[in-house]
């Protein structure tokens, strides 16, 4: 699964609108939409905010790991 698919999947799983996901990420709604459409790669700070909200590791969110858990 690629990053844009993961963002969309988690957003829908958590029943969050694109507008709310954008607020969580600290970006405009249109910018967030461009992440889900695969047109723009989010900054690391955005990815961290989204991974924290979705309660997954950053590696899992970006497809580098099959382990969803966060080592705390």
Residue ranges and their predicted role:
Residues 38-49, 68:
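Short, basic-rich loop-to-helix N-cap that marks the start of a DNA-contacting helix
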Residues 36, 54, 65:
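DNA major-groove recognition helix of helix-turn-helix
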Residues 13, 62-72:
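Short, charged recognition helix plus adjacent turn
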Residues 16-34:
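Short alpha-helical DNA-recognition segment
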Residues 1-13:
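A short, Lys/Arg-rich alpha-helix, primarily the initiator
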């Amino acid at each position: 699964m690629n990053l844009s698919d993961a963002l969309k999947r988690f957003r829908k799983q958590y029943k969050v609108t694109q507008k709310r996901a954008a607020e969580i990420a600290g970006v405009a709604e249109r910018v967030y939409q461009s992440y889900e459409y695969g047109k723009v790669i989010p900054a690391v700070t955005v990815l961290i905010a989204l991974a924290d909200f979705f309660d997954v590791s950053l590696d899992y969110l970006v497809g580098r790991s099959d382990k969803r858990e966060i080592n705390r």
